Swiss-Prot record:
Domain note: Has the structural arrangement of an alpha-helix connected to a beta-sheet by disulfide bonds (CSalpha/beta).
Principal subcellular localization: secreted
Name this polypeptide is given: Potassium channel toxin alpha-KTx 2.8
Function description: Blocks Kv1.3/KCNA3 voltage-gated potassium channels of human T-lymphocytes (Kd=0.71 nM).
Organism of this sequence: Centruroides elegans (Bark scorpion)
Paired cysteines (S-S): C7-C29, C13-C34, C17-C36
Any further remark recorded for this protein: Negative results: does not inhibit calcium-activated potassium channels (KCa3.1/KCNN4) of human T-lymphocytes. Does not inhibit voltage-gated Shaker potassium channels. Does not inhibit rKv2.1/KCNB1 potassium channels.
Length: 39
């Protein structure tokens, strides 16, 4: 799921993704936006 959080690295996405999807969520930075995924 792409969320409306700007990023330059996946580390910036980890907290918002975990906040939204729980502690097992993963995060990537794609095209300057965070992408969350559940493993």
């Amino acid at each position: 799921t792409v969320i409306n959080v700007k990023c330059t690295s996946p580390k910036q996405c980890l907290k918002p993704c975990k906040d939204l999807y729980g502690p097992h969520a993963g995060a990537k930075c794609m095209n300057g936006k965070c992408k969350c995924y559940n493993n």
